[in-house]
Amino acid sequence: MMTLKNPVHPGRIVKSSIEELELTVTAAAKMLNVSRSRLSNLINGKAGISPEMAVRLSKTIGSTPAFWLRLQMNYDLAEVKKQEDRIF
């Protein structure tokens, strides 16, 4: 199985998707039924994708909730691996 050594924060994928749809952050937040600050935190890498947000993204932007959660999981695992020596 191929894995990325340094996957991007999934918020960057969300941001790209929003831009491809030619939406503003405010408009996308309304479509997702979340606050603008919540979406802003996600796309700026300050928050992750929860299962609830994954469902919202799949219904609004596309793909599946599992896709969005896998992006988050891969990112989180890569971040932990960077600190593996300090963990053990």
Locate each region found by the language model:
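A short, Lys/Arg-rich alpha-helix, primarily the initiator
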Residues: 1-23, 70
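Short linear interaction segments
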Residues: 2-6, 30, 81-82
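Hydrophobic side chains within well-formed alpha-helices
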Residues: 10, 64-65
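Short polybasic/polar patches that bind polyanions
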Residues: 19, 30, 59
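Short alpha-helical DNA-recognition segment
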Residues: 23-41
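The DNA-recognition helices of helix-turn-helix-type DNA-binding domains
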Residues: 35, 46, 61, 72-75
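Short, basic-rich loop-to-helix N-cap that marks the start of a DNA-contacting helix
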Residues: 46-59
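Short, charged recognition helix plus adjacent turn
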Residues: 66-88
